[in-house]
């Protein structure tokens, strides 16, 4: 990794992108070319040497990348992503890196504004925490797949228990515990797959007819139509907020 790329990476990831733009415009125009993507990489057990090896691997196979390593994370900024071939190559490189070095990674979507680098890094870090908790067997994740969960995790301190159908959802979970039913998890999986009965049944490892029966009972218990899009979205957000609260406790 060249010295100039290290310097630019430090400026960009330490929030001095505008200063870089104003002070060294020629260098900026030559090296930092939109569109961008950010990737955040970490080890399951902190290992700085492993992170550095992984960063070197990415730099060797993909030229237009800036690498910044801080504490337990390696932050990567991919630049000049103008073709579908580039986008696919980045995904493949990061997936291969995760497997080769046994690391966890989250990759952001494309963006053009340099001011968004820090926010994209934050969102990737959040997505990585959430995704690894939900899918511990996976190593490579995409920020956009966890957008709702990221937003919920940020909103939790401000919303608290003032969530949509808070009492009803809590009672649903309590009934599951008392009667050993799985209505709460069934509802969550159903909403996560966009109210698709067959997909939800598959995720729950139950027959489609069993899923339909459970959903009808859930409708009765909650007293709302969970298939109405506006209601479904609000319930899903409430469930994600409740789960985020449990994880933080």
Predicted features and spans:
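Cytosolic nucleotide-utilizing catalytic cores of signal-transduction proteins
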Residues: 1-249
């Amino acid at each position: 990794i060249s010295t100039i790329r290290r310097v630019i990476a430090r400026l960009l990831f330490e929030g001095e992108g505008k200063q870089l733009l104003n002070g060294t415009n020629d260098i900026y125009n030559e090296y930092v070319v939109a569109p961008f993507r950010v990737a955040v990489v970490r080890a399951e057990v902190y290992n700085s040497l492993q992170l550095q090896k992984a960063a070197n691997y990415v730099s060797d196979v993909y030229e237009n990348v800036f690498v910044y390593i801080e504490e337990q994370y390696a932050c990567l900024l991919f630049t000049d992503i103008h073709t579908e071939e580039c986008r696919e190559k980045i995904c493949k490189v990061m997936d291969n890196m995760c497997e080769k070095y046994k690391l966890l990674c989250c990759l952001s979507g494309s963006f053009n504004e340099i001011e968004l680098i820090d926010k994209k890094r934050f969102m990737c870090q959040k997505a990585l925490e959430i995704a690894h908790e939900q899918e511990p067997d996976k190593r490579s994740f995409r920020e956009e797949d966890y957008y709702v969960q990221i937003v919920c995790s940020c909103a939790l301190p401000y919303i608290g228990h003032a969530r949509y159908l808070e009492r009803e959802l809590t009672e649903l979970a309590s009934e599951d515990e008392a009667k050993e039913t799985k209505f709460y998890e069934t509802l969550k999986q159903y909403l996560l797959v966009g109210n698709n009965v067959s997909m939800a049944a598959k995720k729950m490892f139950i027959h489609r007819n069993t899923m339909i029966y459970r959903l009808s009972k859930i409708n009765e218990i909650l007293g709302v139509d969970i298939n109405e899009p506006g209601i479904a979205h609000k319930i899903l957000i409430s469930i994600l907020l409740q789960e985020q609260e449990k994880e933080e406790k």
